[in-house]
Amino acid sequence: MRAVIPAAGIGKRLRPHTLNVPKVMINLAGKRLIGHVLDAVESAGVESVSIIVGYKGEQVEEYVNRYYSHLRLDFPYQVERKGLGHAVLEGLEDKEEGVLILLGDTVFDVDFKQFVANKSNAIAVVKVEDPRRFGVAEIDGDHRVTKLVEKPENPKSDLALAGMYYIQDQRVLKASIEKLIADDLKTRGEYQLTDALQLMIENGEPIDAVEINGWYDCGTKESLLDSHRFLLKHHLSTEHSKGSIIHPPVFIHSEAKVSNSVIGPNVTIDKGAEIVDAILTETIVGKDAQICNMILTNSLIGDHAVVESQKRVVNVGDYSELKLN
């Protein structure tokens, strides 16, 4: 079995944090996002991985080759962004082999080994309040998918596609995507993976819907921090600090410096960062960043950033009111 991971996204909604790195290279809980995805792939028993790269793809390639060289890796480059179906096609081969497809900017709460143990094709689904923003699966009483629709205006189901797919024979999916492109069948101007899977269903290929506990799309600051909380919760806390108060879960790099501060919960402090006289909760601090005399929550601090304020000495009497901007 092999895996295909689309990771060519620019991450416009995460700017300025994606001006210098691709979205999948943002640091969460002590590891780049693509690293967490590859850990999931390995837990499913995958040994061969195609990572579809684009924007600043050389950074992805360098990181993955450094830390995951034990896997068989290749990095197809998506020159033109023509949709998820087109991206996935770049990583498929003409071999009778199962393929696990995971979106490179998504964190999943699922048993991956159990997911790929299905005896048929499978897609991960999650119940959502507003399915119109997602690909949607309609299913029968046996959880067999009867229809897939990309971002329907009037959804007939509340089961959203979560961005994880297992196809028993990659050649079948490859043929479906190639037909979309040959016939120029687009939805919202792109070749959609959802439409290729629907073609498979229409051609008699069974696909099961597997409801998972949850998934975290890292496309916005808010969803990125949600993913961060989930990852810290499911990993052992790593603390390296003296003279500070730590509220787990946190990740503090062994080469970070934290002094006279309160850290956590849900904080990552990357290599070389220095935190002095600060209170941090729900925050990600990048490599070599400096934070001094600050109270931060729900914050993203980039690599080499400097965030500081001044200490103040005040003398405030009874019934007084002091407001500091």
What label would you give each PLM region?
Residues 11-16, 132:
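Short N-terminal binding/cap micro-motifs at the start of the first secondary-structure element
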Residues 25, 137-139, 209:
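A structural signal for short hydrophobic beta-strand segments in well-ordered beta-sheet cores
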Residues 2-5, 13, 27, 31-102, ...:
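Conserved N-terminal catalytic core of the sugar/cofactor nucleotidyltransferase
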Residues 10, 105-106:
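Active-site metal-binding loops of divalent metal-dependent hydrolases
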Residues 180-325:
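Left-handed beta-helix
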Residues 50-54, 125, 284, 300:
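Short internal beta-strands
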